[in-house]
A protein has these predicted regions:
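Cysteine-dependent hydrolase recognition
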Residues: 11-195
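Bacterial Sec-dependent N-terminal signal peptides
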Residues: 1-11
């Protein structure tokens, strides 16, 4: 497999071997997950490239959601990004004053704990028109970042790209082993479907 690696401002890009023509995809992961699951993530990148979807892998020790979003917007503008998958420990935007955008979640934000009354949402990453006001980072769950949906923001969702998350479950098994096994299965399924 041929790929090039480019490091800019702490995040590292593993570029696809396939040239980007019409669209691209990205795997966004943390440095620890990349190091532990590098072979599986690169195999996933390669199989998607063979299917005609050039795929970037971008990893970093992400400090805040804004850093992740900058990379996504850059890939969208430069490389026609159509979607991303977040793998491992990627910051989780916890939205407040945005319950009207959910289908069923309604809770009094003033009288309930922030964690319970906020909406975890990757719309922070995949709808580029939405605007947010940073409030704080959670003191216990340091991967949670609280934002208000800004008053000047659009009040409806219109995603520019699609997104998904692959995260280990808390079942006592080592998280990277779970992620590694998952991507081995995904690649194997793609290989079966491609034959």
């Amino acid at each position: 497999m041929l790929c090039s690696i480019l490091s800019l401002r702490a995040q590292t890009f593993v570029k696809p071997a396939v040239k980007v023509k019409d669209t691209s995809f990205a795997v966004i992961t943390d440095k620890g997950t990349f190091q532990a699951c590098e072979a599986e993530l690169k195999a996933y990148q390669e199989i998607l490239g063979m299917e005609g979807l050039p795929t970037f892998i971008v990893y970093n020790e992400w400090n805040k959601p804004e850093d992740v979003k900058k990379v996504i917007v850059k890939l969208y503008k430069k490389d026609k990004l159509e979607g991303v998958v977040f793998v491992g420990d990627i910051p989780i935007p916890m939205l407040r004053k945005a319950q009207h955008m959910t289908s069923a979640f309604k809770m009094d934000e003033k009288n309930n704990d922030w964690r319970d009354s906020s909406v975890p949402s990757d719309r922070f990453y995949d709808d580029f028109d939405l605007q947010f006001d940073f409030l704080k980072q959670d003191s216990v769950e340091n991967n949670f970042f609280y934002y208000n949906l800004a008053i000047k923001s659009p009040q409806q969702i219109r995603c520019d790209i699609y997104s998904a998350r692959v995260k280990a479950v808390d079942n006592g098994e080592e998280p990277h082993a779970q992620i590694s096994r998952y991507f081995k299965k995904v690649v194997a399924e793609h290989q079966i479907n491609n034959n």
